[in-house]
Amino acid sequence: SSQSRGLGDVYKRQGLTDVEKAAERLADALTTNQRILIVGDYDADGATSVALCKLALTAMGAEQVDFLVPDRFQFGYGLSLEIVALAQSKSPDLIVTVDNGISSLEGVAAANELGIDVVITDHHLPGSELPPAYAIVNPNRRDCEFASKSMAGVGVAYYLMSWLRHTSVSYTHLTLPTTLVV
């Protein structure tokens, strides 16, 4: 049927602003054994995003990858100041947000002040100002030419992990299992 779609119909990674920069930062974290903290939202999209990134990064050799899925009613939504304080107790070198972060100006600034790089992956609509993150992967950025603007957060996380897997072939330090789907 005309509704039937296959893997050949998946959007290409090109045009997704900052995906290459984010993947390069993650590759650096992997090759230098840095501590990576994934911060997700506690809904289904956030939980699947966290699981995808944790599994993919571990499969690509990350030895120090942890995650945090805070209760938004206790800590607020996104990378809030409270969540940055909680994250600091895990001593990350890099925070990767999944399904949140696009409106976290104060939280990202606080993480930066602590010397923690932040990579944001999100699908929510950005405000007039973007957070001062190392990289922001969001198809709804005004400067993003990605083919789809209607993707869940886990889709954005998937494209980042896919780009990391694709570009990491040139990193001989990384063990890349052939069973990894991304």
What are these regions (language model features)?
Residues 11, 54, 158-161:
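Conserved protein kinase catalytic domain
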Residues 1, 43-48, 147-155:
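Short, conserved micro-motifs enriched in small and acidic residues
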Residues 1-11, 173-182:
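Single conserved hydrophobic/aromatic residue that forms the stacking wall/gate
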Residues 34, 130-174:
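A structured phosphate/pyrophosphate-recognition subdomain
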